[in-house]
Amino acid sequence: MKAHFTIYILFLLIVSSLYSCKSAKLSDAEEKQRIGEYYEAAAIYRKVYTKTSPKKRDLRGYIAYRMAECNRLINNTAKATSAYMNAIRYDYPDSTVYLRMGQMLQKTGRYPEAIKNYDIYMENDPSNLLAINGIQGCELA
């Protein structure tokens, strides 16, 4: 009888510890990003992104963009580039994604690709100085 009781108590402890584990939530990531904890926000966005179904294209695009912004702000260019690519693949509606993608590609020395992204961005905002200077910088490199 004691063995069954011990197993039962052990089972309850394991189950309760599993329920107490905090799962990654989009709202948690947004809050971390809002207060400037970009590294933690990027990690949470990554977990949420992998748990989100590929069928939810709008949500995955949004999460990818936010994750890219966090990685850009902590100067993690490789992860930011990858996340911007995912945001573009999932048709993120804000054209700023092309400007940021151009900046990340320029930073890694991929100048022809950067110019293409700057050009796509400039279709919506032809007088943007960041894009103009980015293109000139790529051409001079």
What are the language-model segments listed below?
Residues R34, L73, K107-T108, G137-A141:
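Register position in tetratricopeptide repeats
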Residues S23, D58-Y62, T96, L130:
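Start-of-helix register in tetratricopeptide repeats
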Residues Y62-R66, R100, G134-G137:
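Canonical tetratricopeptide repeat
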